[in-house]
């Protein structure tokens, strides 16, 4: 019988632990943690993600210092806001919600964030510390994957992990974290040939490509662990909108030993890791 990796339940547990930590340290520090999420424009999906993050902040006791800017906001204006937040002692974490309008350079803005407040873990300083195996703020989605695997006591050492996708958000930091855990890592991508032959060798298969239901049961090794990072909105036969992953869940669940659902798998874990990074950064003020 396939075991479901319940990211939603684990995220709830993590948030409860973070809430207790905030309550216990708030008197010593003199204020709650503060997270500033910057959103530009009116992308509906981004709006949903930002509201989810703000709701999660409230549950844990983090002050949400979010700012919403009109679409025409300039690069210089956003840069000035980031510099002010870098200097603001009430702000522990800064996050720029992606995607941004086309006239804005997200990489340039990311570089302007103080690395110690980069709770998304995407600043070159934090990615460099990951590469070197040093402590630092970790990218939220791959960190959430690792935490979920740890919770279910899934052995990583010596296992062959295949990652589909090479983005700086998921694929590349995911590979580094798995290497840190002594896995043997293969990264496949849009130019990889004979994909099924690659995925069939995976003890742990992690998909982050954004292609609805591309992974079939025939592509999965019996007994594998399947982590579906993909979040795709599709229209079903009845004309209703629904969220699906990169994996054909029902058929792959017949083959895999463990599998994450979409929704309810990695999505909640990503938010939980964002909150954890924010609280951890804030808690250093005690020391």
Swiss-Prot record:
NADP(+) binds at residues 165-167, 190, 231. Its EC number is 1.5.1.5, 3.5.4.9. Coiled coil: none annotated. Transmembrane segments: none annotated. GO terms for cellular component: cytosol. InterPro entries: Aminoacid_DH-like_N_sf (IPR046346), NAD(P)-bd_dom_sf (IPR036291), THF_DH/CycHdrlase (IPR000672), THF_DH/CycHdrlase_cat_dom (IPR020630), THF_DH/CycHdrlase_CS (IPR020867), THF_DH/CycHdrlase_NAD-bd_dom (IPR020631). It catalyses: (6R)-5,10-methylene-5,6,7,8-tetrahydrofolate + NADP(+) = (6R)-5,10-methenyltetrahydrofolate + NADPH; (6R)-5,10-methenyltetrahydrofolate + H2O = (6R)-10-formyltetrahydrofolate + H(+). Pathway: One-carbon metabolism; tetrahydrofolate interconversion. Keywords: Amino-acid biosynthesis, Histidine biosynthesis, Hydrolase, Methionine biosynthesis, Multifunctional enzyme, NADP, One-carbon metabolism, Oxidoreductase, Purine biosynthesis. The keyword Ribosomal protein does not apply. It holds the Pfam family THF_DHG_CYH_C. It comes from the Bacteria. One of its GO terms (biological process) is tetrahydrofolate interconversion. GO terms for molecular function: methenyltetrahydrofolate cyclohydrolase activity; methylenetetrahydrofolate dehydrogenase (NADP+) activity. Belongs to the tetrahydrofolate dehydrogenase/cyclohydrolase family. Homodimer. Catalyzes the oxidation of 5,10-methylenetetrahydrofolate to 5,10-methenyltetrahydrofolate and then the hydrolysis of 5,10-methenyltetrahydrofolate to 10-formyltetrahydrofolate. PANTHER family: C-1-TETRAHYDROFOLATE SYNTHASE, CYTOPLASMIC, C-1-TETRAHYDROFOLATE SYNTHASE, CYTOPLASMIC-RELATED. This is Bifunctional protein FolD. It comes from Trichodesmium erythraeum (strain IMS101).
